[in-house]
Amino acid sequence: MVGVTSISSPAISADERSHEVDHPSSLVAHFGADQPLPLDCGIDLTPFQIAYQTYGELNADRSNAILICHALTGDQHVANVHPVTGKPGWWETLVGAGRPLDPSQYFIICANVIGGCMGSTGPASINPATGKVWGLDFPVITIPDMVRAQAMLIDRLGIDTLFAVVGGSMGGMQVLQWTAAYPERVYSALAIACSTRHSAQNIAFHELGRQAVMADPDWHNGGYADRGIHPHRGLAVARMAAHITYLSDAALHRKFGRRMQDRDLPTFSFDADFQVESYLRYQGSSFVERFDANSYLYLTRAMDYFDIAGDHGGVLAKAFAGIKTRFCVVSFTSDWLFPTSESRALVHALNASSARVSFAEIETDRGHDAFLLDVPEFFDIARAFLESAGKARGLNGRGG
């Protein structure tokens, strides 16, 4: 069982330690008016807080820290029982004793992103200026904003250089942003099932989900919290539509085919006759119990805005010019949300910038979500990459 472990650091005050119970099972770092978060939209967010989890212990020279960046609907509960759902952590396949990210060797950190809804400041938080829930008054945030906030947390923890930054999907975008914005602070980077910019198709899928949320009569232009209601129907539809993109035709056929749900014949109604219908309805209904609808709008928009070459004249290689970080880029053959062609474009740009990079395309029919599932080849690649990076840094055997 992986435990949640805090660290002793003079940068974290006793008063802040007293606030660790602000959110179930999470540590919370508070940043006051003297430490505003500058956002890309031109607004300084202050005050704000970041909810996070840690696993393992930071070694004496603070060289074994790994930051995990979560995906769109993830959170900081990587390898512990989720306080809302009661389910195992979302990446227990990768994080744990004997696994590629082993807390006995590494100090592992995962923070709920700014704009999220599991303890970090977001649209579901209280606006200190009004005493009410932010709602749509919350400023629009970007992937660089998320990473900027994470860097402030890493500073607070007294860590100069991260041994590795790891993430898939939206988490992979954060990994790339970390290496572009703070290249001297990232020794190695594992970017999984992601892209350097969101495609037109993916923006379209996100707009579909946002429109489903906003069409729900209970949304009230984002002001549902003040009315004590939630746009669960719209958010459930958004989740159902998005979840399809995380799968593959082959996986859906293998798992469900055209099999009926608890019946032999069609009902000639609009009930969930097919197993795949029942599965999607479950995905939608379970999601709304743990996620905020406005956060969904904000985080999908942040992904849409992501274009790491945008500040470099559209030349991707310039974003990584002179970088010393070791990269491992991973894609999956059946991922049509972030296809391998996008990972190859990233690898070509890294090669053009003379970065040290390895690339793996893994054969699987499990779609985009393969990085969250039991795919042994992926685990082997992640383990080998981290062990190689650890050996190069003289880290192996010195964790904890």
UniProtKB/Swiss-Prot annotation:
The active site is at S169, D335, H368. Gene3D superfamilies: 1.10.1740.110, alpha/beta hydrolase. It catalyses: L-homoserine + acetyl-CoA = O-acetyl-L-homoserine + CoA. It holds the Pfam family Abhydrolase_1. GO terms for cellular component: cytoplasm. Its main location: cytoplasm. One of its GO terms (biological process) is methionine biosynthetic process. The keyword Transmembrane helix does not apply. The keyword Amino-acid biosynthesis applies. It comes from the Bacteria. Belongs to the AB hydrolase superfamily. MetX family. Transfers an acetyl group from acetyl-CoA to L-homoserine, forming acetyl-L-homoserine. This is Homoserine O-acetyltransferase. It comes from Bradyrhizobium diazoefficiens (strain JCM 10833 / BCRC 13528 / IAM 13628 / NBRC 14792 / USDA 110). The lineage of its organism: Bacteria, Pseudomonadati, Pseudomonadota, Alphaproteobacteria, Hyphomicrobiales.
